[in-house]
Structures are given as C-alpha cells and as structure tokens.
Amino acid sequence: MYQLKNYLLSMQSHWMINHKTYQAVQETLPDIVKFKGQQGMEDMSKTPIHKVIKKIHPEIYRVPLFRRKFCSMLIKEIEHMKKEIPFEANTDEDQLRQIPEIVLREHVPELYRSMWFVVQSVLNPMFNAIWQRDCKDPSTIQIANYNLKDKKQGAWHHDESADISVVVPLNTGKYKGGGTAFHNYGEISPLPTGHALIFPSFINLHKGLPVESGDRYL
C-alpha cells in the first residue's frame, strides 16, 4: 500500500478545485435542494453550474475541475508511485480494452479518500444539475496511462460498471496525440490539464485515441 509523499494530496478539501467551478457548485446547491423538495412535480431550472459546464455533444460535457497546481503535484507523485506500484491492466476486461492503471482504493487509499470527497461535494451536484440524478458512490477511481510501450490507444467500448464517467487529463502538452472518440459524434482533442470530460459511458460508445509519444496520464 502506497503512502503519499505530498500530504496536500490527501487533504479532503476544495483547495484543488477550480475556483469558478467551486463557486458555481456552491451557488447551485439551493436549487438542487429545492428541486428534490418538489418530489419531481416541477422542472429543474438552469443553475449556476450550467454557466461553467460546456456541452460538446448531446450528453457529453466539459468543465474546468482541478487547478493546474494540483495536477502538477499529482504528476510528481505519480513518479514516486511508479517506483512502488506498477500500472496494471484490469484482467476482468478483455485485452483490447485493458488500460494500464493504478486503482486508488486498493493501492493509494489516502488519495482515494480525497477524490471520493470531490465526487461527493463537487461532481455529484454537477450530475444533479445535468441529469437530476445522484451518483455519489464511484465504482472505481484510478489513474490511467496511455503510452507507446504499454498501451497507446483504447478500443470501442461501453463502460459496463459505470453510468457516468469523468475523465481528467493531468498533463496535456507533455505528450503527442491522444484525445477521445465518440462513435456518433467524432473526435475530441485532449482537453486542457485539469478539465473534466463528463459523459454517460454506459450508453456512449467511446475510445481513447492513439498516443504518438510520451505518457498521457488521466
């Protein structure tokens, strides 16, 4: 079990969240409470969250989530992790869809707890604003690595274990290639570091695009 070298990464707080996004989430919470109190008898109105979330395609969104400083710290921490924990594929998946990853709950519980806090306090309100649905218990939180040696691209798939996926690039600009393709909509170039791609992965056929050089961390 890996212990974080940078204690800031273990803090269950909002310091790592983009300021405008965090403010929008806080301003949206009363709207969510009001909607739930109406027990489905009224429509959900547009919220402050809708001002920071951009719809790329139907049901596919992007939003600035993490501060660049947090992503930079996490990349440095990953270099320490690799000395103690290997990136490994999920053997429950078929080989074409296996991506080298570190599952945080099993290997880095301190970081898992801080990311779980982000799901509860930031992402779940976003899911409520977009889809009027709670999704507070993540099936898995992991760090993935696309590279030429181990896995340069993914294959078309649906995520059977998750209704909603949140993919956050940690080091855009430090590799060539990458991005995400959606079967019905085309390709999306790598988002800026810390910006989240949010979509219902159970119903949207998608894949990671080839990395030409470097390590793409998500």
Feature names for model-found ranges:
Residues F117-L218:
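Catalytic core of non-heme Fe(II) oxygenases with the double-stranded beta-helix
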Residues M1-K55:
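Intrinsically disordered terminal extensions flanking catalytic oxygenase cores
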Residues I17, A24, H57-P58, R62, ...:
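Short, functionally important structural connectors and interaction interfaces within domains
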Residues D31, F35-R133:
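Non-heme Fe(II)/2-oxoglutarate
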